């Protein structure tokens, strides 16, 4: 994936210590709408673009005992849609890391919901937005930077935002995925997964739908359906930490 840079320990963009990853693309919609050169990331845009493996970034994050979240920021993460979703998918599925992911976007909430962003097909973009939210435990900061406004404190992020149109929303897990508590069974299934090239050992067909986590179990997570996946490796359980919210 392509990035502009990494800050291993960032304390200015979220209330928890975070790894910050700067994405490399932007349409500079803030400057266009404000009719001037006001972008706070204009210098970053001039920096060289780096090519890195998403797995290396995730492993780097997981090795740091200080950081508790990952912040994906500017330029504009949603203008790198071919890297944004695969990164979060890899974090959740391959590395089984369910830490909070914070996304800073200059798009509005309505633009993202309606697929009015990027250069793609609106229907595809709407599906992309929903697929993103299905991963859960996300915080998304919305809104353009507008110059000459008073900064305000955002309760969700725990930091100051520059324009009064900007705000963050949390998209929590309704359920959470856990490994089966039977460690012997987990070991056995993981050995079979390895032998099977990552495909579900209880399925005959090998395609994207049967790659662990299989599509059927991902749909169960999406719809907050409790229970085990077919092979028994994962269990979707109620996230009791969200009770009463």
Feature names for model-found ranges:
Residues 80-88:
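Active-site-adjacent beta->alpha loops and helix N-cap segments on the catalytic face
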Residues 30, 124-130:
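Short, glycine/polar-rich helix-capping loops at beta-to-alpha or helix-loop-helix junctions
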Residues 175-245:
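Long, distal/terminal scaffolding or interaction modules
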Residues 166-175:
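Charged phosphate-binding loop/patch that engages nucleotide di/tri-phosphates or the phosphate backbone
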């Amino acid at each position: 994936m392509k990035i502009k840079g990494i800050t291993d320990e960032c304390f200015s963009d979220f209330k928890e210590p975070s790894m910050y990853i700067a994405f490399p693309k932007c349409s500079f919609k803030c400057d266009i709408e404000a009719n001037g050169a006001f972008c706070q990331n204009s210098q970053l845009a001039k920096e060289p673009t780096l090519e890195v493996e998403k797995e290396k970034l995730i492993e780097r994050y997981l090795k740091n005992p200080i950081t508790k979240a990952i912040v994906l920021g500017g330029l504009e993460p949603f203008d790198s849609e071919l890297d944004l979703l695969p990164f979060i998918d890899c974090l959740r599925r391959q590395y089984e890391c369910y830490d909070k992911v914070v996304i800073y976007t200059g798009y509005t909430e309505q633009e993202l919901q309606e697929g009015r962003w990027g250069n793609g097909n609106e229907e595809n973009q709407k599906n992309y937005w929903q697929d993103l939210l299905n991963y859960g435990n996300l915080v998304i900061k919305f809104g353009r930077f507008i110059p000459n406004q008073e900064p305000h404190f955002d309760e969700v992020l725990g930091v100051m935002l520059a324009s009064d149109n900007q705000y963050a929303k949390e998209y929590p897990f309704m359920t959470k995925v856990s490994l089966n508590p039977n460690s012997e069974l987990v070991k056995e299934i993981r050995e079979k997964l390895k032998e099977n090239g990552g495909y579900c050992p209880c399925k005959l067909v090998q395609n994207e739908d049967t790659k662990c986590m299989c599509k059927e179990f991902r749909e169960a997570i999406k719809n907050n359906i409790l229970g085990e996946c077919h092979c028994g490796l994962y269990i979707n359980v109620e996230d009791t930490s969200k009770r009463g919210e």
